[in-house]
Regions:
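Mature, soluble, non-transmembrane domains
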Residues: 71-145
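Sequence contexts marking disulfide-bonded cysteines in secreted/extracellular proteins
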Residues: 6, 16-18, 138-140
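Bacterial N-terminal signal peptides
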Residues: 1-8
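N-terminal secretory signal peptides
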Residues: 14-70
């Protein structure tokens, strides 16, 4: 099952479209360049919370920081250091812009895509087997899904 919401960008911000595609559906949501987008999901082995924070660019997504609920996840992913901030282990890094974020959600799991005050929830579903793809593009004339 897939739940989606529309975000209206603030005045003056350059809008682009966040495109969400599954095997059966495609939807477009207005989002501002420079806005943060987070992916939040349980770790596939340990089950604890992982949050990946990106900055939206005209061409995609730039990773800004990773937030882990447990220090063993920092070690699991091979990061040399992390700071404990407000109960999360935070790794900050600037990475090249990714043009695509491919999401794979296992059964009985979910990934939340959060931007602004909105949240899209991707769950495993037999229709699209838990696969979804996020991209950024110029918005078509009608930016509704």
């Amino acid at each position: 099952m897939l739940f989606v919401c529309l975000l209206v960008t603030t005045a003056g911000a350059q809008p682009v479209c966040l495109n969400l595609q599954t095997a059966r559906t495609s939807a477009h949501y207005s989002i501002a360049v420079g806005e943060r987008l987070s992916l939040v999901f349980p770790h596939s082995i340990y089950g604890s919370r992982v949050e990946e924070q990106f900055r939206v660019t005209p061409k995609g997504f730039q990773l800004l920081e990773l937030r882990y609920a447990e220090p063993r996840l920092v070690e699991f992913y091979g990061h040399e250091s992390a700071a404990n901030e407000d109960g999360a282990w935070v790794v900050r890094q600037r990475a090249p812009v990714l043009t695509v974020l491919d999401l794979l959600v296992s059964p009985d799991s979910r990934t939340d895509v959060i931007f602004g005050t909105e949240k899209l929830t991707v769950k495993h579903d037999s229709l699209f087997e838990g696969r979804a793809r996020l991209t950024v593009s110029a918005c078509p004339r009608s930016d509704h899904g």
